[in-house]
Amino acid sequence: MFNVRVNVTLACTECGDRNYITTKNKRNNPERIEMKKYCPRLNKYTLHRETK
């Protein structure tokens, strides 16, 4: 059975730190994901985007 879920890294758009690792289903979400998450370096919530 082929596993569709893959691990992705989320990077802060303001400072560039890669703060989070999560999984996504490539079949349901083929585009890159974006989430508002907490950035410990900036001490605030910022937009985090999926990186390669």
Swiss-Prot record:
Coiled coil: none annotated. The keyword Ribosomal protein applies. The keyword Ribosomal protein applies. Gene3D superfamilies: Ribosomal protein L33. Keywords: Ribonucleoprotein, Ribosomal protein. GO terms for biological process: translation. GO terms for cellular component: cytoplasm; ribonucleoprotein complex; ribosome. One of its GO terms (molecular function) is structural constituent of ribosome. It holds the Pfam family Ribosomal_L33. Belongs to the bacterial ribosomal protein bL33 family. HAMAP family: Ribosomal_bL33. This is Large ribosomal subunit protein bL33B.
